[in-house]
Amino acid sequence: MSKIKVLFSTANDSKVLYPHLYGPNGTSEAKNSQESNDYLTDAVFQYLKNDDQFEVYECPWMVHMYEDSPSKKEDLTGYGFTLRKQVNGTPNLLSVDEAIQRIQAKEFDYVVMDSRTVNPWWNQRGLSPFFDNTVKILQTVLSCYPAEKILFFDGEDQITVIGGLVGKVTYFKRELQFDHPLIHPIGYCFPEWKFRDASPEEKTKDMATVIPGDKSTYLFTDENSYYEDYRTSRFGLTWKKLGWDCFRHHEILFSSCVPVFPDIKDCHPLTMTHYPKELCAEILDCGVVLDGYYKHQQYHDLYCFNNVRVDFSKISREYYADLLGRLKDHALKHLTSKKMVEYILSKTN
């Protein structure tokens, strides 16, 4: 059986490919600025590279995804935990001209593009150095492939969409807040092989170390310690960032930790549709989260919560075990990379 050929034409402000962006004369603030990697694109890419059914091509190189690449973990979003610097093997790299020729020959079953690469907003700020090539590739793809063969991931924090592409691609929107027959809701996903199981008896403390927005609690620079902290904690704090979906929500679940999500009831029904929002609301209502927490603005529309506390004695151990079991079951049934890829492909029929 022949493999499914997929071209990823997605790019970011890679420090390896575009070092001129960084430093005192670059458009990024400083040399220690992290790359703006997209979690959704990277999670799907990682899964397809690990599944023998797919033959994955790249234009440009997804350099930050490969274990033996020159990318440095400290330069990547979230130190590269879970997704980046973890793919083995040789990349199938194509030049822009080669990619265009193969697209014109219709060699690919699917072409993946994303808003991080296509959206002029990034280019206008000097953070999309592949943009001119992207325009050429996108024009070729649109002229050669039907919408069901073009997978477009809009992982922007804003609720707006690129209207000119709707109907011309299979459009997936992360922060979706309006119903449209040609736009599909989507959220982040997590590699199933990274799931860490834990029983209630293995928990050693009530609350995980990280408090979102409090940089003094961002202590972890290695993946194992970070996830073990969640795995051995009964609860983990999380809430909306600039957009509703946030990889931290998933890190908590896939570490067998119960998320305390104070603003979950404000999330739009079409946003985070795969996430267990009802269970998160149940956690707020069961009595374990104490009254007195409050929201404060950090800047623009980014906010945090203060004084979020739990009292484990307010619920029974049996209820906690049942709740944790339901959350883990939901995560493995709906939020793995495999399940998200199946969902994506189901929308191309």
Where are these regions (language model features)?
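Nucleotide-sugar donor-binding catalytic core of glycosyltransferases
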Residues: 2-321, 325-347
